[in-house]
Structure formats: structure tokens, C-alpha cells
């Protein structure tokens, strides 16, 4: 059976190669895996090396559970993956590559015992050419050594803000090309870079830069053809460039185009995508081909006024997203990515900060198609060691080159909440800014910290200044957001400012009506009602101040933090609007959906705060379909008032009956009746002693 399988696979590869010059196939099935800790190097101890392998398919992580259930009790270290693969003689004269989309965190790849490449960093892709190490007509062993132990020279330098899951947690691809190709190993990028200038409704100047590589010892007469197609596949324009490709390193070739009356990429309103196909031809035959998206758009930030897309004011309703899921860790399929994006679209968000690292390229591609405006960043976070500068630059270069053609990306994130020593952090941030501008002069850069004053030395080292402000949670009172933004607006009107994180934790098992204006996050009680109160007020302030160019609530989903134990749940950040398992949407989710989305929303809050503490209470309704009617035990209540925004409705001094109370709200919109209903239980007055003490300190990176 094994020989039959090899023959079938060999025939299949041969058939594929005869049909297409470049073949990209999944390399994710049938891996063997073993995890440490190891008392000795298992590669050097035959008995240890040959025993106890587990069969796995990729994506895979060894931390799917232990990083999520107990604080500081997870495995970080080495894991090995092995895969035996037959490569037929028909590959003679071809070039063979392996492309890894993401391995946590530091990787060595071996083919038949030979080291073919090393990579440092958990979140960017990397590609190695393996052809010279292969034995054609035979089985070959691919071995991957992954290590997610923290290192001072690789960012992130710790697991403090989020866990770096170990393993080959994103897909792997086998790539086969001719000797002359569009380069595969330029930081694992597509090898094609599309830039746009002078974008308007009248015209746009498009430049397509292609990097070619000759893997032989002979110059080749070739033709490079770059063609732009409409979304429906109709050819718009094309350019052919005859060339002689020498075998002396990667060569760069450029085609320029002017698109007249281009169909613009207009965010969620109209995310129109052209397609650019770069083809390499020899003797009239296509020997390589790469397809990339082209969304024709122009981003502009005007201090004090807002964000503009193609000259039109564009609302920046922002959320953030960590990539891990409960029970899966970071080993996600496209199904999980699509689910997360569906929730982000449903809430009405227009922009996403994918934090705090490069995320799946599939995710960025979907954002291109959905019209979401994207912030992409590197994991330079939390702490510095003085040894990470080279790796930070490497990861930024990889992020930019791999993600260069995504029209959804408007900004490159350089750092997040990196503190002492300030001079080192500021200097490295400036270096990263300069690198980003060299690689991509047309996009913005941003750096982020928790210092809320512009004159701090780590500020003002990028195009955009991001500030994480957790008023009422980590610092001061939740209402202090307004004097903060007013002060900056008056003192620094020229500043491009974004509120890059804000919010509060919410454990759904914790509920209360007794709410102050600040919560002691060091205690274990994290009520959902305080999170709701925080978002209600703070979004209302943000919405009134265009000086805040964009705001990004923290976070769309609860996520794992393996070094934490807070709010009654170990290894968890509870600031999400949706629970870690993606099953429950918190009240705050519907607050933003009512404010942002065009879909009808009618929602009663505090549905989990069932056991009421007060006989005289209030009822809150979110409605973007007009003033709702509210009923208590079948009787209509009067005196409804407008709250912080025009979707916020409050009824004060509602008197509950002893026992079960049914609250119902009704609204009619476009001839359709909408309803929502919840139940509360009142059994007598209850007093709660809670620590609502105000934190006088400035937020500094928790």
C-alpha cells in the first residue's frame, strides 16, 4: 500500500507540473510530533528519538490547553515535527521550497539531516529552498525543531501580555517552480510589490515591481508580463518587458500603468478589487505566475478632523483582535478566522487593529474583500532587553514585504507599551520608523504607549501617536477620558492621535448594580455591568471628538494571558466583548452594534444580572430603530429618556415586584415589530461591599 501511495503521489505531482509552472500544494497532513522537556538532545539519543511520536495534522500547537487554564503553568521549550515525503525524479531541474506561514517561535528546518534554514519570530512567514538537500526518487525526511521559550533577542521577549503558542500553528506549503522564477525567498513575500500614486476618481498611477531569480548558471531570455484585470476578470491593461535574467542574485523589474476612471476601493461601502497577474514567460510559455490584489485607494489623516478614504471622511469604528481561541490556541483554520471576521462585520466595525503581531495572511486578504481598514503590527511589546533591535527590524521587514499588496492595510505598528529605558525605546522606534518608510513610503507608521501626555520621550517617534487609556480601570475615573482628550486637543492640535486601547474586564459570572466610577482591578471582582458602564460613557466621548482620529476598543474577544490570574479566571484577559469560546456576546457588544451598525438593534442590558440587589432600579435599552416602549410585568413604563448617544435609552426609578419580573421592549421599524425580553428576580435589598477605589497612577503597560 505504501508503494502504491508513492506511485500515485508521484504521478499526481508529475501531472500537476505538466499543467502549471508553479505549483503550490498543502504540506499539512501526516506529521509526527513530540514535545519536550528533554533531558538530552533527542536527535543524538536513538532510543529517545525513535519513541513516543504522535501523529498530527497542521496547524498544530502544543499549548492549546496549558496556556489557557492555569497561570504560569505552561510548557515553553522545544518540540519536534517529522514528515516523510517521496519526491520523484520528475522534479529534476525544478526548484523546491517549503513556505511556513507561522511557527512559534524559533525554528530550524532540516531535510535528510541537513540544516536548510533558521527563522526567529513566531508570527511572520518564512520560506527555504530545499531542492539541493532532496534525494529524488526516494523518501525524504523533513524535520522541524520549534522552540517557544522566551529569548532576549527575539520579540516578544516574554509571555506577559499574551502567550506565544509553540508549534507549527499555521499552514505549510510545498512550492515547486522552474529554475527561473518570481522570487519565493524575498522575506517569503509574493515577490511582487504594487504601489499607487495620485489616486483620484479621474485616474491613478500604478507601479508593479517584480523580483526575479535565476537559479541556474546560465542567463535566460525571458519576458515579464504584468496585467491588470477587473474584478470580473476583464483585462484592463498589460505591459510586456523582454529581459535577460542573469544568475547573479535577485533582479528587479518595473511596469507602470495609468488607470483612467478607476473603480476605487471604498472600504465597507464598496471594497472593489482589481487583480494583478505577473507572468514570467520563456519561449512564449508561462513558466511562473503570481496573482495579487489591487484595491485603488488613498488614505489621508487630517489632524483634528479625521480619517479620509479617497477624499471622503471615513468613520473609524475600531476593534482589536488577538488570534487565539479557547481549546485551539493559535492553531486556527480559515473557518475560525472567518467566524471572527463575521462578528467584527456584524458589530459594524470599519477598522481593526490586529494585535500585537502579524496575523494570518488569509485574514488580511479577507479584509481586502470585506472593506475593513487594517492596522498590522509587530510584537515589540511590554518590555525591552537591549538585545532585540535586529530581530525587531527583521520582523518589521517581513511584515511589510509579505503584506505589502493588501489595500486594507493603512498603517504599520512599531511598538506597543514599551517602556524603560526610554532612550533606547525611542531610538529603536525611530529606527523602525525609518525602516518602514524605506520599505513602504506610502503608508503611515504608529507607535503606542500608555503615557497620556504627548511630551513623553517615547512619544512622537512615528507618523501617528497611539495612546492606550484605561480610565476607570487601570487609572483615575472613567469620566477622566474627556478632560484628557480636551487637554491634548488644546495643547497639541497638530498631533495625529488615536485612542488605541480602552475598556474594562468583564467576568459574566460577576454582576452587580452597585457601580462606582473606578474599579480596583487588583481585586477579583470584575462585573460585566462595570464594563458596560465604561463603554457607554467612553464611546460617547470619543464620538464627540474628531481629534481622536480612530479608536480601538480592547478587545473584540477574551484571550489567553498565561502569566495572569485576574478576575476569578486564570490565564485570561476578560476585556473582550465576546467570550473566549466565542459563544456569548456581552452587553457591550450590543452597545457598539447599536451605535455602529446599520442593522436593526433592540437590546435590553443586564440580562445576566438576574438576582437584583435593589427594588428601585433602572432599565437600559439600546435601540437604533427609534424610541422603544418598555413593559414591566405587562405594564408599560413611562419616563424614558435619552442617554449618552441617540441609541441609548434609560428608564430611571423602576420599581420591581417581589419575585420574578419580566421586562420587555418593543419598537417598530419599517413596518416590522422588534422585541426583546429578559427576566430579573428580586427577593429583597442586598448590600454589596466592593472596592471601587480610584487608581491615581498612570497606566503603564498592564
Where are the regions that the model predicts?
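Short, solvent-exposed loop/linker segments at the N-terminal edge
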Residues: 196-204, 609-615
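Extended substrate-binding grooves/exosites of carbohydrate-active enzymes
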Residues: 55-69, 149-152, 161, 165, ...
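Accessory beta-strand-rich segments of carbohydrate-active enzymes
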Residues: 32-37, 76-185, 189-191, 215, ...
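Beta-strand-rich binding/interaction modules
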Residues: 111, 201-244, 251-253, 617-639, ...
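Bacterial Sec-dependent N-terminal signal peptides
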Residues: 1-23
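Extracellular and select intracellular beta-sandwich modules with Ser/Thr-enriched
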Residues: 168, 237-239, 253, 287-291, ...
Amino acid at each position: 500500500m505504501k508503494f502504491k501511495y508513492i506511485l500515485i503521489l508521484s504521478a499526481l505531482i508529475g501531472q500537476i507540473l505538466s499543467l502549471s509552472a508553479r505549483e503550490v500544494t498543502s504540506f499539512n497532513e501526516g506529521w509526527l510530533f513530540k514535545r519536550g522537556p528533554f533531558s538530552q538532545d533527542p536527535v543524538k539519543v536513538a532510543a529517545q528519538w525513535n519513541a513516543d511520536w504522535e501523529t498530527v495534522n497542521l496547524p498544530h500547537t502544543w499549548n492549546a490547553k496549558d496556556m489557557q487554564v492555569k497561570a504560569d503553568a505552561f510548557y515553553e521549550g522545544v518540540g519536534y515535527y517529522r514528515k516523510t515525503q517521496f519526491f520523484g525524479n520528475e522534479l529534476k531541474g525544478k526548484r523546491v521550497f517549503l513556505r511556513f506561514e507561522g511557527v512559534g517561535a524559533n525554528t530550524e528546518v532540516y531535510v535528510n539531516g541537513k540544516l536548510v534554514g533558521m527563522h526567529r519570530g513566531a508570527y511572520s512567514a518564512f520560506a527555504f529552498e530545499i531542492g539541493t538537500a532532496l534525494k529524488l526518487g526516494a523518501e525524504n525526511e523533513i524535520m522541524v525543531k520549534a522552540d517557544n521559550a522566551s529569548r532576549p533577542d527575539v520579540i516578544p521577549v516574554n509571555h506577559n501580555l499574551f502567550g506565544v503558542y509553540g508549534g507549527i500553528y499555521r499552514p505549510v506549503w510545498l512550492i515547486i517552480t522552474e529554475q527561473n522564477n518570481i522570487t519565493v525567498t524575498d522575506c517569503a513575500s509574493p515577490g511582487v510589490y504594487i504601489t499607487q500614486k495620485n489616486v483620484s476618481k479621474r485616474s491613478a498611477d500604478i507601479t508593479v515591481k517584480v523580483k526575479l531569480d535565476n537559479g541556474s548558471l546560465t542567463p535566460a531570455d525571458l519576458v515579464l508580463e504584468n496585467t491588470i484585470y477587473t474584478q470580473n476578470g476583464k483585462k484592463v491593461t498589460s505591459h510586456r518587458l523582454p529581459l535577460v535574467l542573469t544568475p547573479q542574485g535577485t533582479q528587479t523589474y518595473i511596469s507602470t500603468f495609468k488607470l483612467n476612471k478607476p473603480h476605487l476601493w471604498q472600504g465597507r461601502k464598496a471594497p472593489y478589487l482589481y487583480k494583478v497577474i505577473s507572468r514570467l514567460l520563456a519561449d512564449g510559455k508561462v513558466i511562473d505566475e503570481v496573482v495579487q490584489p489591487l484595491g485603488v485607494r488613498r488614505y489621508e489623516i487630517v489632524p483634528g478632523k479625521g480619517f479620509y478614504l479617497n477624499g471622503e471622511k471615513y468613520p473609524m469604528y475600531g476593534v482589536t483582535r488577538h488570534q487565539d481561541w479557547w481549546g485551539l490556541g493559535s492553531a486556527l483554520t480559515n473557518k475560525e478566522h472567518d467566524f471572527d471576521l463575521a462578528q467584527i462585520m456584524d458589530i459594524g466595525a470599519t477598522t481593526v487593529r490586529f494585535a500585537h503581531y502579524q496575523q494570518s495572511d488569509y485574514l488580511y486578504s479577507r479584509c481586502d474583500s470585506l472593506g475593513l481598514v487594517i492596522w498590522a503590527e509587530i510584537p515589540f511589546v511590554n518590555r525591552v532587553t537591549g538585545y532585540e533591535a535586529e530581530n525587531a527590524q527583521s520582523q518589521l521587514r517581513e511584515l511589510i514585504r509579505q503584506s505589502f499588496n493588501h489595500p486594507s492595510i493603512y498603517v504599520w505598528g512599531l511598538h506597543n507599551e514599551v517602556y524603560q529605558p526610554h532612550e533606547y525605546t525611542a531610538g529603536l522606534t525611530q529606527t523602525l520608523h525609518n525602516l518602514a518608510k524605506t520599505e513602504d513610503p506610502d503608508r503611515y507608521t504608529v507607535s503606542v504607549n500608555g503615557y497620556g501626555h504627548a511630551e513623553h520621550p517615547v512619544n512622537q517617534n512615528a507618523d501617528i501617536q497611539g495612546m492606550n487609556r484605561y480610565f476607570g480601570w487601570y487609572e483615575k475615573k472613567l469620566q477622566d477620558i474627556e478632560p484628557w482628550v480636551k487637554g491634548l486637543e488644546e495643547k497639541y492640535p497638530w498631533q495625529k492621535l488615536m485612542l488605541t486601547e480602552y475598556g474594562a474586564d468583564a467576568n459574566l459570572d460577576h454582576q452587580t448594580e452597585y457601580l462606582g466610577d473606578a474599579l480596583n482591578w487588583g481585586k477579583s471582582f470584575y462585573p460585566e455591568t462595570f464594563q458596560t458602564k465604561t463603554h457607554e460613557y467612553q464611546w460617547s466621548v470619543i464620538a464627540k471628538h474628531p481629534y481622536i482620529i480612530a479608536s480601538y476598543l480592547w478587545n473584540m474577544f477574551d484571550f489567553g494571558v498565561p502569566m495572569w490570574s485576574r478576575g476569578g479566571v486564570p490565564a485570561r484577559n476578560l476585556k473582550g466583548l465576546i467570550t473566549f469560546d466565542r459563544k456569548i456576546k456581552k452587553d457591550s457588544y450590543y452597545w457598539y452594534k447599536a451605535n455602529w451598525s446599520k442593522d436593526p438593534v433592540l437590546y435590553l442590558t443586564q440580562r445576566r444580572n438576574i438576582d437584583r440587589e435593589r427594588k428601585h432600579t433602572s432599565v437600559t435599552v439600546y435601540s437604533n430603530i427609534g424610541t422603544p416602549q418598555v413593559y414591566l410585568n405587562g405594564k408599560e413604563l413611562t419616563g424614558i429618556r435619552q442617554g449618552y448617544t441617540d441609541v441609548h435609552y434609560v428608564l430611571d426609578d423602576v420599581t420591581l415586584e417581589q419575585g420574578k419580573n419580566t421586562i420587555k421592549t418593543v419598537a417598530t421599524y419599517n413596518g416590522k415589530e422588534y422585541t426583546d425580553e429578559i427576566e430579573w428576580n428580586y427577593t429583597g435589598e442586598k448590600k454589596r461591599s466592593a472596592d471601587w477605589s480610584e487608581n491615581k497612577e498612570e497606566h503603564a503597560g498592564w
